[in-house]
Amino acid sequence: MNNSLSLFVKEMRKRFGFTQVDLAAKAGVGLRFVRELEQGKQTLRIDKVNQVLALFGYEVGAVPAGKEHSV
């Protein structure tokens, strides 16, 4: 996963005053998943990522990658 996503989730979790345990419980995912998400694991289930992001009013979506990635 993109490191900026990991940092975003960690920052939002702290802003909301959640521990990793709190976030896992509120999002309905495992603690291990939250840890892996915040550590930038490269392969994560998008549905679970969206469960976490939904707590903060966000979801994973397609965005422009930048000029170097254009067809």
Task: Kindly label every feature range from the protein language model.
Residues 67-71:
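Helix-turn-helix/homeodomain-like alpha-helical modules used for DNA recognition
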Residues 28-42:
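Recognition helix of helix-turn-helix/homeodomain-like DNA-binding domains
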Residues 7-22, 26, 51:
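Short basic helix-loop element that most often maps to the first helix and adjoining turn
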Residues 1-4:
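A detector for short, charged/polar N-terminal pre-domain segments
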